[in-house]
A protein has these predicted regions:
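Short alpha-helical transmembrane segments in multi-pass integral membrane proteins
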Residues: 1-26, 84-151, 193-249, 305-370, ...
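N-terminal transmembrane alpha-helices
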Residues: 13-50, 64-79, 83, 108-115, ...
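Transmembrane helical elements of multi-pass membrane transporters/channels
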Residues: 24-43, 145, 156, 179, ...
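Helix-terminus/linker motif at the lipid-water interface of multi-pass membrane proteins
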Residues: 38-56, 126-133, 189-196, 256-289, ...
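Small-residue-rich hydrophobic transmembrane alpha-helices
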Residues: 56-116, 153-172, 266, 279-343, ...
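Short runs within selected transmembrane alpha-helices of multi-pass transporters and secretion channels
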Residues: 77, 145-164, 172-183, 201-216, ...
């Protein structure tokens, strides 16, 4: 096998100044996440501007379900990332090789299962969420087409997990940029020229997903060394599969249950008028923007902690935890304040309807200054995965951010029935989950 320096030429995570290296590692991830959000926002903006408020509401009504399915694949990718990084840190390149060739099968199967589930359950799920009758046909069409891209998204997340684990966060950014630009061009063509509305946006999205997956898999097939992909070696190794699934499945379950709690919230929002639903849909684009920018540091947290754990450098594990927490908190705070200041121009990107903008501003007014609180929760979860713990963090998130939210909806929101009482659910659940998650990480860090 090649030496570590040859294989991880982009970044050595176990030596050198952590703060600078974490930032270098995270910046391409931030741009990747920012581009991904920008391309998703372009979908919504094109629909809102050229297909009308009803089409905007249709696409917005699918956001939680898409987040759920994407979260499952992100969870699997997170498992690939953590296990690969651990073995890279330990310089166990044979296990890296087995992890990569096992994971590609696991992720692809997950993508296929989501595709089938999407085709079968899209409309029933939207009906359970009390989607407005005037929106459900467009929402169903968009969702069913969009989920046909699940296998491609699964393979992209696999490749991204592998490359991030070995310190390469630049190539995924390049591939995402290429596919994203194509996505924008196709959006405009299908919606404005072909007048396909939400269907056109969905088709453009899945074409872009397959392009990004093709690019990243093509690179791995041409890469030498332990993390390169070889068709003849693709097979499931039981130990590698168990290691990836031990982290990936709880993470996927966490994302799924978290999204289910948000489905309950969306159902509550759907109890208001369609104008409120559309305003909320426009404002939630900020959620993706801010969360995903912060998430770059969580990926760094898991990767750096796993590699340094593998290299038996315990002091760098704790320093990584605090550095990524500081970075993610500041990112959430700065972006939240900027959103509050520029809330109207932001909402005008998606709609020109004053009533819709008004209800979007209500959501932003509550959320803008509390996004940063989520850093304490998500960073602790990422750190726990980095040290190989995923089941209990999932249970903590389920109790604090799923069960608690459902109880809140059935009690506090049911009593007040205001948007403010609904939106406060986020910061309170984040705080409770963060307290438990940080206690858990601190306990297990001492036992490393």
């Amino acid at each position: 096998m090649k030496s570590r320096a040859t294989q991880t030429k982009e970044l050595d995570m176990v030596n050198g100044p952590l703060a600078r290296k974490i930032l270098i590692y995270s910046i391409p991830l931030m741009f990747s996440n920012l581009l991904q959000v920008f391309f998703n926002m372009t979908d919504v903006a094109v629909v809102g501007k050229f297909a009308g408020a009803r089409a905007l509401g249709s696409v917005g009504s699918t956001t939680i379900i898409i987040t759920l399915t994407t979260g499952i694949l992100l969870g699997m990718g997170g498992g690939v990332n953590a296990v690969t990084a651990l073995h890279m840190g330990a310089e166990d390149y044979q296990r890296v090789h087995k992890t990569v060739h096992t994971s590609v099968i696991l992720c692809f199967i997950a993508g296929l299962l989501l595709l089938v589930a999407g085709l079968v359950f899209s409309k029933p799920l939207l009906e359970v969420m009390n989607t407005k009758p005037e929106l459900i046909d467009g929402a169903t069409a968009y969702l069913m087409i969009y989920l046909c891209g699940s296998p491609a998204l699964a393979l992209y997340n696999f490749g991204n997990g592998v490359l991030s684990a070995v310190g390469d966060t630049k190539r995924p950014l390049i591939y995402l940029s290429i596919s994203g630009i194509i996505n924008i061009v196709l959006n405009l063509f299908f919606v404005i020229v072909c007048r396909l509305g939400v269907i056109g946006v969905a088709i453009a999205s899945i074409i872009a997903q397959y392009i990004s997956a093709t690019l990243i898999i093509r690179f791995l097939l041409k890469t030498y060394g332990s993390y390169g992909l070889r068709m003849k070696d693709i097979a499931i190794d039981r130990d590698a599969a168990a290691a990836v699934l031990r982290i990936g499945v709880p993470a996927a379950i966490q994302y799924s249950l978290f999204a289910i709690a948000n489905i309950c919230i969306q159902t509550s929002i759907n109890s208001f008028s369609h104008v409120v639903v559309e305003g909320n849909s426009a404002a939630t684009n900020a959620d993706s923007l801010i969360y995903d920018m912060m998430a770059a540091f969580y990926t760094a947290c898991t990767s750096f902690i796993a590699q340094n754990l593998g290299a038996r450098k315990k002091e760098r594990v704790l320093r990584t935890f605090f550095i990524t927490l500081a970075y993610s908190f500041l990112m959430g705070l700065v972006l939240g304040v900027a959103l509050f200041i520029f809330q109207r121009p932001f909402l005008l990107l998606f709609t020109s309807d004053d009533a819709v903008i008004h209800y979007g501003q209500i959501r932003i007014g509550v959320m803008a200054f509390v996004y940063c609180v989520s850093a304490f929760m998500d960073n602790a979860t990422a750190a726990a995965r980095g040290i190989g713990k995923s089941v209990m963090p999932t249970i903590i998130v389920v109790m604090g951010s799923v069960v608690f939210r459902i109880i809140w909806l059935l009690t506090v929101f049911a009593y007040f029935k205001t948007l403010q009482s609904l939106y406060l659910i986020y910061v309170i659940s984040w705080t409770l989950t963060a307290i438990a998650g940080n206690i858990y990480f601190a306990y297990h860090y001492r036992r490393i």
